[in-house]
């Protein structure tokens, strides 16, 4: 069963990647030459730095793939973290066609396979810069070394980062590359976790309000077949730090996704990486969650999201709102309808409707410690006032707190 599941995951990623063959223009080739010079220069500046298993910065030291990832990042080229994953990208280069800036790959001595365990940056004339356990970052002529020439398995040329797609969600996500990972974080100022990044980006780019957790987002999105993936879709992964849906990233095109990585920060990663390939579960699209702003009640209600705090007894944006005060104010302002002041009376002010018949602008009630009214805006979402967040949007079908507190709905006309 596990073998079948893993095979399905492999096919899922393979279908996505097979469409992605980059073609370079003359201008991009010129830019690539400049990038190679920068990468080689950066690598030479790191000569003498110590070896460190898992190291990827000058401060801590470098392992082989950490060094390669670091010097390429200085040219704004984002590489996977492991040797094996770096070997999967770029263009294969024959030994006679090597240029400075190419990456050389080596297998374990005595191995009969072609799995790379070490990589290095080619700098010309048979020489390479790499990080070794015995001497740290050094220059070695691999052609004159029986060890390195005997374990050489190939080279890759990675001239430039593939361009991220020119769609609002991807362009917005790209702004936050480098922002630290913070568990529970959902803004650039505090940092992001994976679902916090997805939620924030969709709100900023498209005005789409997603649930907070990855598993809740997965539940409300539109399922997308791998062959139909497009930039701006969200890719979900399972069994990372917990069982089930547990991680998400925004597909950026060219087989890459932007994510808040628990081990790094907001970064660009490749779906072809062994780790992500084994964890990938599926794809979701959220175009269907666009708020129907043409509805005057919905339009008015969403004006105050994130702008107005909770205030006991509050009935205006200037003072803040309590739960019923918010609903009363929106209906009066948007539709000229005078509702009673308190939730119990509001519940009796309209026509009772079934949950399945809800339309944007209807009033939905939840029973917590008291009766809480909210305004339905479509797609299972409501605008309401909470003590902690003020005016906010909640998906009433996936919220762990509100989904079991549904008490009824009315339509006021």
Swiss-Prot record:
EC numbers = 3.4.19.-
Q: Which UniProt keywords apply?
A: Cell wall, Hydrolase, Protease, Secreted, Signal, Thiol protease
- Which EC class, in a word? hydrolase
Q: Where does the UniProt annotation locate this protein? A: Secreted; Secreted, Cell wall
Positions annotated as active site in the UniProt record: 194, 247, 259
According to the entry, every stretch annotated as the NlpC/P60 domain falls at 33-159, 163-287, 291-413
Q: What are the GO BP annotations of this UniProt entry?
A: peptidoglycan metabolic process; proteolysis
Q: What induces it?
A: In stationary phase; under control of SigD.
Signal peptide residues are 1-32
Q: Which family does it belong to?
A: Belongs to the peptidase C40 family.
Name of the protein described by the UniProt record: Gamma-DL-glutamyl hydrolase
């Amino acid at each position: 069963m596990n073998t079948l599941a893993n095979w399905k995951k492999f096919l899922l990623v393979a279908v996505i990647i097979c469409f992605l063959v980059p073609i370079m223009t003359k201008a991009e080739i010129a830019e690539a030459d400049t990038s190679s010079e920068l990468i080689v220069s950066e690598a030479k500046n790191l000569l003498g730095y110590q070896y460190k298993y898992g190291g990827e910065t000058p401060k801590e030291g470098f392992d082989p793939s950490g060094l390669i990832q670091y010097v390429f990042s200085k040219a704004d080229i984002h590489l996977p973290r492991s040797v094996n994953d770096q070997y999967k990208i770029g263009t294969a280069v024959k030994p006679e066609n090597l240029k400075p800036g190419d990456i050389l790959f080596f297998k374990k001595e005595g191995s009969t396979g072609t799995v790379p365990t070490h990589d290095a940056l080619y700098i010309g004339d048979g020489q390479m810069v790499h990080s070794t356990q015995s001497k740290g970052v050094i220059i070695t002529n691999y052609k004159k070394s029986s060890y390195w020439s005997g374990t050489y398995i190939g080279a890759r040329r990675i001239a430039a980062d593939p361009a991220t797609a020119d769609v609002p969600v991807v362009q917005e996500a790209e702004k936050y590359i480098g922002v630290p990972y913070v568990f529970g974080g959902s803004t650039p100022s505090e940092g992001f976790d994976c679902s916090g990044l997805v939620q924030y980006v969709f709100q900023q780019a498209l005005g789409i309000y997603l649930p907070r957790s990855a598993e809740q987002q997965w539940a409300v999105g539109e399922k997308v077949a791998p062959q139909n993936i497009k930039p701006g879709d969200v890719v979900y992964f399972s069994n990372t730090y917990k069982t089930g849906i547990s991680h998400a990233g925004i597909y950026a095109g060219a087989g890459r996704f932007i994510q808040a990585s628990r081990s790094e920060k907001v970064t660009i990663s490749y779906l072809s990486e062994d780790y992500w390939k084994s964890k990938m579960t599926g794809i979701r699209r959220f175009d269907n969650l666009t708020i129907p702003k043409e509805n005057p009640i919905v339009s008015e209600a969403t004006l105050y999201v994130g702008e107005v705090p909770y205030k006991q007894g509050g009935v205006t944006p200037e003072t803040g709102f309590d739960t019923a005060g918010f609903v009363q104010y929106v209906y009066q302002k948007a539709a000229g309808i005078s509702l009673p002041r308190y939730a119990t009376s509001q519940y009796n002010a309209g026509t009772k409707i079934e949950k399945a018949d809800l339309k944007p602008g209807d009033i939905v009630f939840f029973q917590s410690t008291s009766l809480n009214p909210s305004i339905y805006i479509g797609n299972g979402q409501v605008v309401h006032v909470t003590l902690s967040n003020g005016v906010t949007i909640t998906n009433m079908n996936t919220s762990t707190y509100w989904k079991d507190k549904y008490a009824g709905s009315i339509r006021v006309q």
